[in-house]
Amino acid sequence: MVRDKVTRAITGLLTACIMIAWVGGQAKGLGDIFAVFTGADPIPIIMLFNVVFIIYTYLGGIYSVVWTDFLQGIIVVIFAFIFYGYALAPVNFSMAVLQQKLAEVGAAELGTLSNVPVGTIMKNFVTGCFGILAAQIYWQRCFAAKDSSTARTGMLISGIAAVVFVSLTAIVGIVTRAVNPNLADPNQAMPWLMLNYVPTWVLAVVYTLILAAAMSSADSNLNAASIILVNDLIRPFAPDKTDQELVKYAQWLTIIVGVFSSLAAIYSSSIIGLFSKAYTMAGGGIVPVLLVGLLWKKTGEPFTMGTRNSRITPWGARLGIIVGSVISLSSLGILWGVAISAVVTIVVSLVTPDVPATEGPSAKV
């Protein structure tokens, strides 16, 4: 929407942060699980899995990523329901029983939303919604689909599946609190339940599938991050680079992103906290500018595919993204960040010049 290389670079960095958070989160989750099962220090395990992720992605590409996701995804879904069956058995698959057990351990507030402020619910919803909109891995698959109907159906199915499995996983965490209120580390809730309530054969299969799912998700995100950085940070500023050179840059960037993912996993307090910061930073800055660009069109000009009809100027986009990201990460939160980002984008665009029409299409965002 903006013919500006600087805006494109800022956007690339922010969206890459989401991928870094996802890769780091996968490694941190595996480290926490392994720590519960073996009692080992999770940090070396986190580093080991990140090295495996890097090598796996470095040697492959998007084609292998897609087929890996598809085949492993089918197996993961089947055994996920088996795992959830055992995980929810301690409360007899009943929300009423769960609520009763929570009340017995003094955690009844976990079974209801009545004590959660509306502002907190809205903030978490916007963080997740806008963060997903800024995640390149979903756009990558949409653009790779054979037509718009396939892309729309695929996103709808994956969205429904995400809601179901995330909800079930959250319930598993609440069940763990009900049956073991003295668990010190909340990050180890699911591994503890697996170790104590799931049969050994199911545990072995589920752990293997968790590793497979982590590999699948991590290589997708590493691949996406390297593509983002090549297309948005290197290609606009070095248009004469050959495809072979760009592929080489992507391979090196896979390693660099993997290193940053390891650091993020080691120093983050929790997986949710890691995701939340990345989603807040990217969603609070990029998505408001995207929405303004889609809605605020030049009057009197018919829409033409492949051309820019938005009234956003380069400086409007730059400042809107930066201000939105900074405010979203501050104590004001993402709701204020989104609103202020949109206002800044419009106001600055009204008082700054537009990009020259002679600039080539390679600089479009």
Map each language-model feature to its residues.
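Membrane-embedded helix-loop-helix hairpins and adjacent transmembrane boundary segments
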Residues: 1-365
